[in-house]
Curated annotation (Swiss-Prot):
Top-level taxon of origin: Bacteria
Source organism (scientific name): Pseudomonas fluorescens
Quaternary context: Homotetramer.
Protein function: Catalyzes the reversible conversion of L-aspartate to fumarate and ammonia.
PANTHER family reported for this sequence: ASPARTATE AMMONIA-LYASE
Protein name: Aspartate ammonia-lyase
Gene: aspA
Length: 478
């Protein structure tokens, strides 16, 4: 590739095997990136949308340069310039130069070349040259030395996921703590549990919210161990298909060791580079775990919407914080917009997992060319989940209040209360009371009192929350 500045100085002319193109003079990307931008106008989501992926790419290029310098393949001056460029990308500079669409043909070559060209042009300026003067430092020959897209790109994806993993875990943990706090706050609020949307047996609102915390806690524990298990084995050094062609035999170990040091992640070389280059199983499993979390979040949000329904004609056991007016035609209406939004995020994550699964299955022979879609969907799922969990916690969970009187009223009027009374009044009496209550619309307690089956003191003892919400063996009445 050769660059020539145009007379207007607003563009520079770069050349590749397909011909010449005018690249914006101020752009740090080059001709191959520009071709990709022109070819792939698809999702509208550029690589820069995911900063951890950009940082992962820069770290891979830094590690490769370090290894090549140690092996005597890269000059000290070029190594210093590439190192400065990578350091700036890792700090967050120049991310706007990563302009290629996340969805692209070529198995990620456009992303890799976007990184190579940006690093090369930053390095050229550090050396005192102009952008595009690749005769002094070349995107392919120098920045991409001993690499293929097929090992640099998947390694950067794995590293980007690892670098962002703690933030995802922190958001999930904070949400769990918020649910647990509400569980403690509502521990005294007796309410009816429901199965199949029908009254079942009493429980506390605190138990309901603690269960939300527990189920998400299971996912937190799995995610903490899953990412290190799945993503720390990298195929850097395998080059095109895993054979390591065009790389020094010592390069793989050096490059991976340097990458582990640079990133602070416990990266190790893949045991089978052919398998590691062609198989996408780690991404499938990790995405499946994200989907599981999304499914749980959506179910929880369904419950929150049901429990707050009404407020006058629904369940109305809890109040969700009012976030915005709910209708352009119905005055005073307020909708559960935060749980609704989380539901939609969950649907997107579930869809992302399906798309990723199909892309993983779509690989052929020694390479999966669908890896750009895999990267896009998994980074998108993480971004959406993290934002949704933060939103749910900040704008909904911490502000939930209980309608204690309503909860108690529903318990006292529920036919399901006869299950708790059954050991004291006997099955025949309990069945008869339930039938009369259903037919007449009267309350169970009212009928029990009327027939003198239990006195008020006994009823008060039976209806104490601690006696209704945990195992308690009572000899059945004969």
């Amino acid at each position: 590739m050769i660059s020539v500045m145009s007379s207007a100085a607003s563009f520079r002319t770069e050349k590749d095997l397909l011909g010449v193109l005018e690249v914006p003079a101020q752009a740090y990307y080059g001709i191959q990136t520009l071709r990709a931008v022109n070819n792939f106008r698809l999702s509208g989501v550029p690589i820069s949308h995911y900063p951890k992926l950009v940082v992962g790419l820069a770290m891979v290029k830094q590690a490769a340069a370090d290894a090549n310098r140690e092996l005597g393949q890269l000059s000290e001056r070029k190594h210093a310039a590439i190192s400065e460029a990578c350091a700036r990308l890792i700090r967050g500079d120049f991310h706007e130069e990563f302009v290629v669409d996340m969805i692209q043909g070529g198995a990620g070559t456009s992303t890799n070349m976007n990184a190579n060209e940006v690093i090369a042009n930053i390095a050229l300026e550090a050396m005192g040259h102009q952008k595009g003067e690749y005769q002094y430092l070349h995107p392919n020959n120098d920045v991409n030395m001993a690499q293929s897209t097929n090992d640099a790109y998947p390694t950067a994806i794995r590293l980007g996921l690892l670098l962002g993993h703690d933030a995802l875990l922190a958001s999930l943990d904070s949400l769990i703590q918020a649910f647990a706090a509400k569980g403690a706050e509502f521990s005294h609020v007796l309410k009816m549990g429901r199965t199949q949307l029908q009254d079942a047996v009493p429980m506390t609102l605190g138990q309901e919210f603690r269960a939300f915390a527990t189920t998400l806690g299971e996912d937190l524990a799995r995610l903490k161990t899953l990412a290190p298990e799945l993503l720390t084995e990298v195929n850097l050094g395998g080059t095109a298909i895993g054979t390591g062609i065009n790389a020094d035999p010592r390069y793989q170990a050096l490059a991976v060791q340097r990458l582990a040091t640079i990133s602070g992640q416990p990266l190790v070389p893949a045991a089978d580079l052919i398998e590691a280059t062609s198989d996408m199983g780690a991404f499938v499993l990790f995405s499946g775990m994200l989907k599981r979390t999304a499914v749980k979040l959506s179910k929880i949000c369904n419950d929150l919407r049901l429990l707050s329904s009404g407020p006058r004609t629904g369940i109305n056991e809890i109040n969700l914080p009012a976030r915005q007016p709910g209708s352009s035609i119905m005055p005073g209406k307020v909708n559960p917009v935060i749980p609704e939004a989380v539901n939609q995020v969950a649907f997107q994550v579930i869809g992302n997992d399906l798309a990723l699964t199909m892309a993983a299955e779509g690989g052929q022979l020694q390479l999966n060319v669908m890896e750009p879609l895999i990267a896009f969907k998994i980074f998108d799922s993480i971004r959406l989940l993290q934002r949704a969990m933060d939103m749910l916690r900040e704008h909904c969970i911490v502000g939930i209040t209980a309608n204690e009187a309503r909860c108690r009223e529903l318990v006292e009027h529920s036919i399901g209360l006869v299950t708790a009374l059954n050991p004291y009044i006997g099955y025949e009496n309990a069945t008869r009371i339930a039938r009369i209550a259903l037919e007449s619309g009267r309350g169970v307690l009212e009928l029990v009192r009327e027939e003198g089956l239990l006195d008020d003191a006994m009823l008060d003892d039976i209806l104490r929350p601690e006696n209704m919400i945990a195992p308690r063996l009572v000899p059945l009445k004969a």
